[in-house]
Swiss-Prot record:
This is 3-hydroxyacyl-[acyl-carrier-protein] dehydratase FabZ. It comes from Aeromonas salmonicida (strain A449). Its EC number is 4.2.1.59. PANTHER family: 3-HYDROXYACYL-[ACYL-CARRIER-PROTEIN] DEHYDRATASE. It catalyses: a (3R)-hydroxyacyl-[ACP] = a (2E)-enoyl-[ACP] + H2O. The lineage of its organism: Bacteria, Pseudomonadati, Pseudomonadota, Gammaproteobacteria, Aeromonadales.
Length: 153
């Protein structure tokens, strides 16, 4: 059995997510799988010194904030959710509902490429649960469990 590699470019990502510069934290999707056995997605966030956050965090020793790693992971889960169920209607948004068991293993800085691997676990009453792992050069930098909720606006 062969598996077709599926990817998404920035325009396709912008069609799915409401986020825009400077808060769009996913540059591309390298692969995703939506099957009965698994629902996974691999996304990329390129961390650049030109990002506004580095003006104050921290100018002499820039560190990409852990909360933004989690945001990138959450945006990757949103993309996975939308590839599973389709883009929300104009009066719907998916809200980041919770983070559990977030662990930060090492700092991330300019020049690093975050690889974001997320997996859908379950959905109940409009609330979806995911796991996420962020790596740089194959080394784990962050893990977390994430939940999002679909709501009308």
């Amino acid at each position: 059995m062969t598996t077709e590699k599926k990817s998404l470019g920035i325009q396709e990502i912008m069609d799915l997510l409401p986020h825009r510069y400077p808060f769009l934290m996913v540059d591309r999707v390298d692969d995703y799988e939506i099957s009965d056995e698994r629902k996974t997605l691999r996304a990329i966030k390129n961390v650049s010194f030109n990002e506004p956050i580095f003006q104050g965090h921290f100018p002499a020793k820039p560190v990409f904030p852990g909360v933004l790693i989690l945001e990138a992971m959450a945006q990757a889960t949103g993309i996975l959710a939308f590839t599973m169920v389709g883009k929300p209607s104009p009066n719907e948004l998916y809200y980041f509902a919770s983070i559990d068991n977030a662990r930060f293993k090492r700092p991330v800085g300019p020049g690093d490429q975050l690889v974001l691997d997320v997996e859908f676990l379950k959905e109940r009453r409009g609330i979806a649960k995911f796991t996420g792992v962020a790596t740089v050069n194959g080394e784990v930098v962050c893990t977390a469990e994430l939940m999002c909720a679909k709501r009308e606006v």
